[in-house]
């Protein structure tokens, strides 16, 4: 077995460009993106550049032109990752790019049409098609989960309470995980499809000027696949692979999307998390960085293993071809170009402590043992006559009685139980036909038959319950070699056919690429051989023009990077200004209602909870109304005997009946202590001044 094998893998980056939509075509926008699938290059022309400026060129592992098929995208992008997770690796596939560039279409597609399905539904058919081809002695357990990150809050899309926020935790043996995230065991691709449909109904979407169904949250669909097979040491080994498929919300500019109100707040959170993702990518590529800011957002923390950790990762950068999206397209391509240099250290997860498959196998063995032992304890006289052993003596009425202590316990099969029931029925019938028995003996024998029958029924019920438990667990395990595709069989055939066509096409492209390289080399060799000074001057001029073009391209690249840096700075400054306004508003409200000395007390006992991203107050469960509900009023005198502090007049929270505290008469007209900041003469003036201050902040 390849257990524990590992290697350094760079993050694979592919680029996909969508076609111009009807709105862009109607407004007369032109495409500024040119893609060469054979060379894997993307060229972007600046619509505002002076004449003669060359287009910017980027090279990636794979590029997909606007006419690319969904099956081709899956086979070249996701198929190697899915094959790896079946072998026990972790894998991540995520779509990155500006809003409205087709990230959700790439990841999900149109699931009602087989040829338009995206990466996530195609992976369902791929996984169960692979299981169907495995050997019979291999066992599989597949479970799925679905979550979203909305406004920096993690929510379970498959949970009952969609308002419940989940905590992100971390353990040395498990890594980063989401506490209380629900996971469902599936047996076929149709189960996965139904679960995904359920989760999509709960996902946050909204309309903007750039996308009518814009994703307002980051969604992560996770498939956990456990397999158990025999190793070289003749022992069962469990390998666990996890596949995270991430549909990111797109970066937005308020001037283009027209977002206001709640949509603007969502866009701010989305941009902040994507900015953190960009910072993580930059820090991983920059060898000088000593700190990677994974914890700055929930998204990067959940993707910690996928970026520079134990995972095989593919990033699909989605871009738009329209000229008015030039800046966003260049920014996306630059981030994607950096991500190519991220190195991951993927290894097979063999025999992890939290594997459910091993627990299920142990439980199955235990249930089988209980079923085999469930009939023990019944006397042999309850079994068929041909299997009786021990001495017998004749009782009154001719009914045989057993001598105790000489009969071994037996394991009962369903056939033996049926024979025992038949024998009891026959003895009941024989008892009814006996006319010469004493009534007392008849009742004794009847009670004995009832006892035996009740014990038999109890054994049958116990076996039924155990069998139901056993069947329920066995249904969760999938045996290799069993075809579970059902309706998805057509999809698997479509994927395999597309994969074969893709291999043939790639082989042709590779041969053509080699031929073009050879011709290019021949041309360069010919140019190097000059027959005269005039030819040499002509050749040098061509080289000079080529170098000059490269110089102009580099200058243009520097200018674009400076402009992009300026735009990012302006966006960050705008976020800072927005947060500052919210902070000043919060501080104004706090200062208006909480005296300064109590603010200092709160600050002294407050701490930051990294897991949920909130400030928490220590011992808050033992304050206020929580204590008022628990403390009886009758204990007032008893509590005063211990000299407790008089907190009855602390900031209008406690009254004569609250917490059994001693009431100290107020000084003056008001019932609250004086504060260092003083108090306005009237409440109306206080409210008016606060309202005017709030209005000034919100303007």
Curated annotation (Swiss-Prot):
Heterotrimer of a 115 kDa subunit (KAP115) and two kinesin-like subunits of 95 kDa (KRP95) and 85 kDa (KRP85). It comes from Strongylocentrotus purpuratus (Purple sea urchin). Its main location: cytoplasm. Residues 400-411 have a biased composition (Basic residues). Pfam families: Kinesin (PF00225). The N-terminus is blocked. PROSITE patterns: KINESIN_MOTOR_1, KINESIN_MOTOR_2. Gene3D superfamilies: Kinesin motor domain. One of its GO terms (molecular function) is microtubule binding. Residues 376-395 have a biased composition (Acidic residues). Residues 620-699 are annotated as: Globular. Residues 341-619 form a coiled coil. Residues 667-679 have a biased composition (Polar residues). ATP binds at residues 97-104. GO terms for biological process: anterograde axonal transport; cilium assembly. Keywords: ATP-binding, Coiled coil, Cytoplasm, Cytoskeleton, Microtubule, Motor protein, Nucleotide-binding. Transmembrane segments: none annotated. Residues 369-415, 432-456, 660-699 are annotated as: Disordered. This is Kinesin-II 85 kDa subunit. GO terms for cellular component: axon cytoplasm; cytoplasm; kinesin complex; microtubule. It is found in: Cytoplasm, Cytoskeleton. Residues 10-342 form the Kinesin motor domain. Belongs to the TRAFAC class myosin-kinesin ATPase superfamily. Kinesin family. Kinesin II subfamily.
